[in-house]
């Protein structure tokens, strides 16, 4: 990591309610430059809500947060200029070609496409999409759409990346290329905030992980730190995740099968 003291994501008591339901409960979180931070949790735990607030797409009910040094509530445009956000599923314009979509993304960020076209070409080649970028997006497979969206996310060289399931729909070779790319970006000082259900990816890529359950951040740390907190010896991240979030164990699964 480039500078472990450069704070790029800072949330204090970040809260979100929808009616009477608390989707996020007083989240405190710090993420640093050059860090790949895994954000993990069961479906409905609050991961997407958190990401949407940190990217300025959803207004918090309470608390505060800053990304890349800018307040998400009072300086959302400055935040958006410095981040890249890959949603799951990604939103693409189907009646544009891949190139036209990337030109549109560059225009949104106020970046002349000529200044980033070489970067776009290199990323397209890395993800093996360069021969199809002239085709309409409506004809793309799920994996091709994911690749194009990722190139768009990286096009303006953002300081902080928010990635929701970045390897979804990718073949093993492309998934490996994406993982290697993210590691290199972190090595160059970028912050990668990664939400994934593939715990093996988080275990092998992330410097630290945060586990959220029912809107509460219940654990934060490196794998070794989480093992120590849970007194779990050499447990895998998957075992720790299931232990902390109350997932079914082997005995419970066997009981269900025997009863059916």
Task: Give residue ranges: language-model regions.
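Conserved ABC ATPase "signature" region
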Residues: 103, 107, 114-132
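A short, proline-enriched helix->beta-strand linker immediately N-terminal to the Walker B motif
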Residues: 155-159
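Catalytic Walker B motif of ABC-type/P-loop ATPase nucleotide-binding domains
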Residues: 161-165
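Helical segment within the ABC ATPase nucleotide-binding domain
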Residues: 175-188
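ABC ATPase "signature
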Residues: 220-221
């Amino acid at each position: 990591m480039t500078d472990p003291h450069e704070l790029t994501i800072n949330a204090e008591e970040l809260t979100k309610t929808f009616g009477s339901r608390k989707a996020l409960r007083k989240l405190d979180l710090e993420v640093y430059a050059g860090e790949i931070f895994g954000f993990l949790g069961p479906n409905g735990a609050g991961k997407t809500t958190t990401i949407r607030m940190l990217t300025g797409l959803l207004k918090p009910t309470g608390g505060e947060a800053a990304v890349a040094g800018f307040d998400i509530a009072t300086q959302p445009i400055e935040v958006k200029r410095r981040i890249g956000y890959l949603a799951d599923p990604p939103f693409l314009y189907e009646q544009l070609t891949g190139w036209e979509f990337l030109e549109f993304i560059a225009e949104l960020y106020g970046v002349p496409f000529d200044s980033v076209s070489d970067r776009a070409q290199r990323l397209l080649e890395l993800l093996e999409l360069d021969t199809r970028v002239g085709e309409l997006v409506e004809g793309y497979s799920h994996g091709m759409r994911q690749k194009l969206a990722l190139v768009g996310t990286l096009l303006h060289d953002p300081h902080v990346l928010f990635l929701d399931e970045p390897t979804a729909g990718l073949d093993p070779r492309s998934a490996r290329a994406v993982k290697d790319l993210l590691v290199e970006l972190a090595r160059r000082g970028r912050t990668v905030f990664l939400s994934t259900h593939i715990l093996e990816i988080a275990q092998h890529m992330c410097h630290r992980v945060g586990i959220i359950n029912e809107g509460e951040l219940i654990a934060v740390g490196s794998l070794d730190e989480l093992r120590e907190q849970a007194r779990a010896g050499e447990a895998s991240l998957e075992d720790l995740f299931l232990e902390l979030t109350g997932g079914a164990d082997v005995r419970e699964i066997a009981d269900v099968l025997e009863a059916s």
